[in-house]
């Protein structure tokens, strides 16, 4: 209620102020400075008509502009025909020149086959040759000769002494032949010794491998039985008794025991 009363009183005051000031601002502006002098009619007419027009163009000049510039001299018919036909054609290329361009440049000379054949093939390395001490065949042959000549070499001097009177002429020849064969067999045996040492199927290689695998058993066997043979026999006995077992509890065969291929 109080707010509405304040609003009504404010509106009433505004209405009273408007009634009291009604017509006073308009009269104040109308009573201000006097207006400037009015524009005379002549000036108004001058601005409306614009600048005075220039002198009129005489009729002769008007006709001259309408007709344009005087035409030039007419082109003679010969010149007209020349432009219609265009420029005279150029001289034709002779047939010989046309054929030369169509054929193009002469082909380059081909490389003779002799130059192609001059390329040498790549060098081929010679095959590797085995030395006498690396030849497995020589070592086997030397081993066979040594084994075959062993008893004869042992019994050769004794037999020669016993049968000296009987075969006097044949004994020196036999001794000479025996010495030659012994020398050859010794040379071949010394040459094939590395190959025999590298072979894994020999008795000595098996004994060495057995010593490497089970040094304790071989040490005991060597003391009791004397040598590597006792150790090898000791190992075989242990295998037979079932001491040596595989990875999965199975018995090891001879190859697995000696070479370590059981697992």
UniProtKB/Swiss-Prot annotation:
Q: Where is this region: Angiotensin-converting enzyme active site binding?
A: 89-95, 107-113
Where in the cell? Secreted
Entry superkingdom: Eukaryota
Tissues expressed in: Expressed by the venom gland.
| Post-translational modification Pyrrolidone carboxylic acid, affected residues | 31, 49, 67, 85, 103, 117, 131
Q: Report the record's disulfide bonds.
A: 247-263
Q: What is its main location?
A: secreted
Record keywords: RNA-binding included? Answer: no
Return the InterPro entries for the record: Natr_peptide, Natr_peptide_CS
**SMART domains referenced in this protein's UniProt entry, alphabetically:** NAT_PEP
Renumbered to this chain, the Low complexity biased-composition regions fall at 181-192
Question: Where does the UniProt annotation place the signal sequence?
Answer: 1-23
Q: Which family does it belong to?
A: In the N-terminal section; belongs to the bradykinin-potentiating peptide family.
Its recorded name reads Bradykinin-potentiating and C-type natriuretic peptides
């Amino acid at each position: 209620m109080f707010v509405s009363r304040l609003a009504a009183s404010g509106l009433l005051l505004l209405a009273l102020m408007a009634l009291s000031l009604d017509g006073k601002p308009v009269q104040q502006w109308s009573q201000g400075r006097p207006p400037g002098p009015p524009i005379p009619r002549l000036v108004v007419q001058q601005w409306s008509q614009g600048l005075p027009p220039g002198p009129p163009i005489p009729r002769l000049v008007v006709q001259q502009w309408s007709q344009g510039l005087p035409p030039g001299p007419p082109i003679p018919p010969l010149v007209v025909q020349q432009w219609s036909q265009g420029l005279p054609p150029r001289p034709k290329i002779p047939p010989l020149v046309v054929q030369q361009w169509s054929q193009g440049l002469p082909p380059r000379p081909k490389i003779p086959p002799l130059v192609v054949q001059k390329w040498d093939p790549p060098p081929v390395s010679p095959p590797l040759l085995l030395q006498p001490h690396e030849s497995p065949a020589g070592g086997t042959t030397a081993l066979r000769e040594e084994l075959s000549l062993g008893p004869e070499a042992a019994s050769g001097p004794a037999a020669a002494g016993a049968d000296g009177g009987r075969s006097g002429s044949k004994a020196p020849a036999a001794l000479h032949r025996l010495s030659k064969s012994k020398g050859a067999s010794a040379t071949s045996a010394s040459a094939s010794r590395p190959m025999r040492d590298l072979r894994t199927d020999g008795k000595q290689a098996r004994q060495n491998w057995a010593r490497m695998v089970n040094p304790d058993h071989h040490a005991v066997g060597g003391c009791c039985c004397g040598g590597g043979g006792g150790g090898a026999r000791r190992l075989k006995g242990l295998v037979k008794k079932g001491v040596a077992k595989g990875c999965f509890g199975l018995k090891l065969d001879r190859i697995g025991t000696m070479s370590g291929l059981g697992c």
